[in-house]
Structure formats: structure tokens, C-alpha cells
Amino acid sequence: MALWGGRFTQAADQRFKQFNDSLRFDYRLAEQDIVGSVAWSKALVTVGVLTAEEQAQLEEALNVLLEDVRARPQQILESDAEDIHSWVEGKLIDKVGQLGKKLHTGRSRNDQVATDLKLWCKDTVSELLTANRQLQSALVETAQNNQDAVMPGYTHLQRAQPVTFAHWCLAYVEMLARDESRLQDALKRLDVSPLGCGALAGTAYEIDREQLAGWLGFASATRNSLDSVSDRDHVLELLSAAAIGMVHLSRFAEDLIFFNTGEAGFVELSDRVTSGSSLMPQKKNPDALELIRGKCGRVQGALTGMMMTLKGLPLAYNKDMQEDKEGLFDALDTWLDCLHMAALVLDGIQVKRPRCQEAAQQGYANATELADYLVAKGVPFREAHHIVGEAVVEAIRQGKPLEDLPLDELQKFSPVIDEDVYPILSLQSCLDKRAAKGGVSPQQVAQAIAFAQARLE
């Protein structure tokens, strides 16, 4: 059933209908459309369009339809309705007859779809926040279990300074906490109801839009009808949050893919999140992580696509805005799936402590400690940096770690070096000295774990 037609003397070309119809993707707004219609029916009672008895009849029919949709959502796609609004209204008329045709009084599909989409966004943000916090908790638990797993930290993919696997986990907890904050912040701005704004100029009925917003669970009603039906900032904000969040998950995946390689060998992934090769029997491929990394691109694309769609649109509603849904649905679905998958990867991951320790002892990751030692002896840092660089070259030439160079050889580079240098070059000393807030010392890592646990309770 089309919601328009009196103005037209010819039926739409079937090819145009297929091009124009949106039911194949906006069917996902069915529950929100029904909930919004119930609230609108209540508002129509307050302005005398519906009697209380008529409203009760409509609400009962809409609630039956809601349960039917939840039980068998696939029925929607069996229809040739133009969009979810047409489908819901058609089903309502099937149930209550002519009374169903009164429901759309004073309402436009413009404010209707804007309301539906905001309700869907609120529901989905709630799911994303839950999944985000679950992944944070999984990372904190993994950190707690691996506080003593010393491994190399990297810059430029070159071994730089020793860290712990726990410290690495906590870095991603910080990223996810910012993602959580972005979602909560976006939720505040989208939590305003556009229902009652009509096509663009507002409704002609003196409906209390604040009361209507409250019935739908919104914090308040929007202030400008023209903006309300044109606004898709919340779509951009959520796509932006998803794009940033997926960058974090992609980096997480890339790190673990590297840690899992035979060349690094720091971790072993569970069989539950890996797959084999159709040809090479020995292979155990990190497919879950590679898919997380790969799916990042499609989310970035959704954000870019939506910004390009909106950038040249005049006020108010334009059909271009129908393009807001597919990219948003896919991006937030993808982000949610990847959050769940990242948590599953951590469930069963094995950290290979001996190999991590061995790698941390290689690559002259304690060179900075030797420079700091020289500074403590009164050598300016820039000079100390040069001295240690020369010492590293000699250690490489001999195929030894710095701590294995005899004292007399170290003293060739600086006479201030003494026997007390050797304890400072140990891995544990490297960690212990990083005791400022946010550092990798065992005390700081333990405090960070406790803080994260308290925040996530």
C-alpha cells in the first residue's frame, strides 16, 4: 500500500518502484516504527483526533503486530510495501479497518523515520556499550593473568624497550574506554525526539512534544522542526565512533597477528578462532583477527559515504537521506560483531612467557637504561646517547647483549661506567624504573588493573 497517490494519474514504473523502495533494509526499524506509532496515537487523543476507545483499539492492534514481528520478522520482506511505514500502516488497517487510516494525522514520514532511526540508534548504542565493556573486562582479566610476562615493546616494529603483556592489554583498555566515552557522548545528543515536527514546518496540532518525547524514552524534544527532519548528525557521530573504534580493533588484531607469527611466537591463539589451509596441513591461520582487521575498511567507507551524501543537501528532507541506513546498519553491526570476536580471541589465548622473555632480552632494549645510568653519573643526555650508540655497535659486532660486555670494554666508551651498571641493565630493573604514572613498572601496572576493575564494576 502506497502512502501517497492522489496527485498521480499513472502508476509508478516497476523499475522505479524497485529503485525507490527501502523495505529491504528499513524493515529493521519495524519495532521502533510500531512503538513510535503507539506514542503518536496517545498524542492524537490529547488533541481530539482520536477518542480514548479508538486509541486503545489502535494500541492493542499495534502491540499484537509488534509481537508478531518479533516472532516472525521475515514476513516483512515478503511484502511489496514501499517502506516499513507503509508496511506497518497497511497491517494496522488490515486489523482495525478505517480506524487505522486516522493514525497518520499530523505526522509525516519525515519526522516518523527520523524518530524511528533515533530509537534504533539508542537501542544499538546500548548493545555496543555492553560489548565494549565486556571486551575491556576481558582485556583487564588477561592483563591480571600476565603481569609477569615480559616482552619487547616496539617502535617502527623494531624492539625498543621491555614492557609486559599486561601493559599491552591495558593500552587497549584505554582506547576502548575512549570509545565508550564517545558513544555515551553521542547518546546525549541523539536523545532528543523529532516526532511531531511533521514534514518540515511542524505539526498543525497542538501536541505536547515534550510529553510525547517522554513517552518514547527521549530526554526531551527537538527545538526546530526544519532541523529535526534534516538532521543526521547522530548518524555521522555514530559512524565516526565506529570508524575510530574499528581502527582500535584493527590495531589490536594486527598486534596479535604479529605476536602469533612463527617469527615472534609470543602467543598462541585458540583453535576456536583459527582455521586451517586446504593445502598445507601445518597451517593455523588467525582468521578471526584478519577479518577484524579487514572489516575496518568497510566501516571507514560507510562514514565517508555518509558525509558525501549529506554535504550538498539543502534543507529539509531529500530522498538522498534514504541512504543513511544501509551504511549505518552495516557499520554498527560490523563493529558489534568485531567487539564480540575480539573478546572471544582473548578467551583461550596462551602467552608464551619464555619466548617473550627471550625476545625482550634481545635487540638491546636496555640501551636507554645505560644512557640513563650515564646521566646519573653526570654525563649530559645527548652525549650519553652517543656513547651508548657506540657501545651497541660494539656489542652487535661481538654478537653479545650489552650486559655481557666486560667492564673494561664498557669503560672504553666512558670511564664513569662501573660494576654497578650491570644490575641496572637487567630486564627487571628496566621495568621497575618506569614507576611514574602510566609506566610499565609492576606497581603501576597493578594499580592500573585495579583502577580499571573498579571502573568496570
UniProtKB/Swiss-Prot annotation:
InterPro entries: Arg_succ_lyase_C (IPR029419), Argininosuccinate_lyase (IPR009049), Fumarase/histidase_N (IPR024083), Fumarate_lyase_CS (IPR020557), Fumarate_lyase_fam (IPR000362), Fumarate_lyase_N (IPR022761), L-Aspartase-like (IPR008948)
Protein name: Argininosuccinate lyase
Subcellular location: Cytoplasm
CDD domains in alphabetical order: Argininosuccinate_lyase (cd01359)
GO cellular component, one term: cytosol
Organism for this UniProt entry: Escherichia coli O139:H28 (strain E24377A / ETEC)
Signal peptide: none
Record field: catalytic activity: 2-(N(omega)-L-arginino)succinate = fumarate + L-arginine
Keyword Lyase: yes
Cross-referenced PROSITE patterns: FUMARATE_LYASES
Enzyme class: lyase
EC number: 4.3.2.1
Molecular function terms, GO-annotated: argininosuccinate lyase activity
Gene Ontology biological process terms from the UniProt entry: arginine biosynthetic process via ornithine; L-arginine biosynthetic process
Main location: cytoplasm
